[in-house]
Amino acid sequence: MKTDINEEERAQLKAAAYRKEQQLEEFQQVKNGYLQLLENFNTTFNDLARDYEETVNDDLAHEAANEDELAANQELKQQTNRTIADQYDATNQLYNRIRRQSDGEIDDLNKQRSRLPWA
């Protein structure tokens, strides 16, 4: 029976592809955690902004300063929501780019492994 002269190299390529897949899974977990943190921050921030608006409305009903503060608070909420949405988009774009790159690297490793002659 002949021994496979490329067995070790084939095993190394398989291990490298597996490590790349593991790194991608870890990155996805980090991404999901980050997106959850963004969502939690956004929820908390909007709750606080709503509570602030209710307080201002209760304490200073119909004053011009009250209207200015409410308008400023609403603008801050909108800016925060836009920033959170931008962060979601940027994070997902980064993940998709890394995913495509990693998938390509994994495919290359698997192709290299498949091209090795058996002998």
Task: Cite the ranges covered by each PLM segment.
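Charge-rich amphipathic alpha-helical interaction elements
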Residues: 1-119
